[in-house]
Amino acid sequence: MSGGLQQSPVRAVVPGSPEWLRLAPTIVDLFERREREQRLLSDKTSDAPRAVDWIYANEDGARRIYYFEASRRVASASADVDHDTDPPGTVRITVAGFLHDASGRLTPLGTKSELRWEQDGLPAGPSRPDFLPLGVVAQGERSVWVMKGQSGTSKWFTLYDVSTSGTRALLTARADRC
């Protein structure tokens, strides 16, 4: 690539590996903080277990940046509803974000949270991250992460500018328009 741009790959961090186990407590802390800030925690959700679902890493020399997704699933079925008009489902609380690893010190670079409702009894589809990192283009201290998203048959790409000062979405384009 020209103009001082460098392309670098992203790798999946293996669940249960020492690297995963080192990152998980920080990710859980960020999840809990985001839940409190966004008021996503209630008596019904607090007992549901949290899970670190995905972690991806990009390494450029001594600099390492991670993308993660974590979630909590809560059954939303209630005994006093009409299941014909309000079918049972699961509320999924998701927190995703980026971490900078500077010599073993993890610094959050931005997180986002979402609530989703998934109807029980329907095929869940393939298990995949909400955003699949495809690669990173870097220039100096800035990195642009190329991410692919999918919901049902809808696909899109999003570019995230990730730097030590934070994260911002630069562009989102539907896959059928690329």
Labelled PLM ranges:
Residues 1-178:
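Exposed acidic/polar residues on beta-strands and adjacent loops within beta-sheet cores, strongest
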